[in-house]
Every structure is written in C-alpha cells, then in structure tokens.
Amino acid sequence: MKVEFDKIPDESRIWIYQSNDDFTESDVDIINKKSDLFVDNWMAHNKELQASFKILNNRFLVIAVNEEFNPIGGCSIDYSLQLLKDISDTINKNLLDRLIVNYRMGSII
C-alpha cells in the first residue's frame, strides 16, 4: 500500500539506488509510473507493505518500507530488485551498479 513518502516513519527501512546519469523528464515519468504501481501492490508473506518512493536530485531513487506496519522478507526485497532491473532496462540507465560513487560539489552532483 502506497503512502506519502513524508508519512513513512524515520525508523523505516530504506534503499537508495543511484543512477550513472541524471534522469530526464521522460525517465522520471517512467520511474514514477513503475514505482507507483510497484509500491501500491508490494507484499510480504501475503500481507501488504506500507511503502513509498522518492526521486532525489534527479539521480537517486529512494524506496522506503514501514516495517512496523508489516515486516519485509527476502523474497519481497528480491522482487524490488526486479523493479530496479526493469526501470534500468527501460530508461537505459544503470541503477544497480554499486561501484558508482556520487558526490556533491557545490550544487552539482
């Protein structure tokens, strides 16, 4: 079940995925549509997960789950990786490369 990102408790579990390039407007639309559908239907052990997502600085996708509502399991986390692979393939940007390091220099990331 999707909730507003700002309503997710601070103690929630989060994953931050970074892109190898800035998201275009089209990328953001695709990410929003796919992520919206995903978090609205995301489940663990046949129980709804209270989840949300946010795009930050046109380069990061943040996914959050309120584990106080229902705990997340390994299969559900794996399912989220399928979403990331799908988004990466669709927008032709790598969101799963752990060797990418982003940093801020002034207002530039």
State the predicted function of each range.
Residues 1-58, 67-68, 78, 89, ...:
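Polybasic/polar functional segments that serve as interface/processing modules
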Residues 101-109:
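Short, conserved secondary-structure transition motifs
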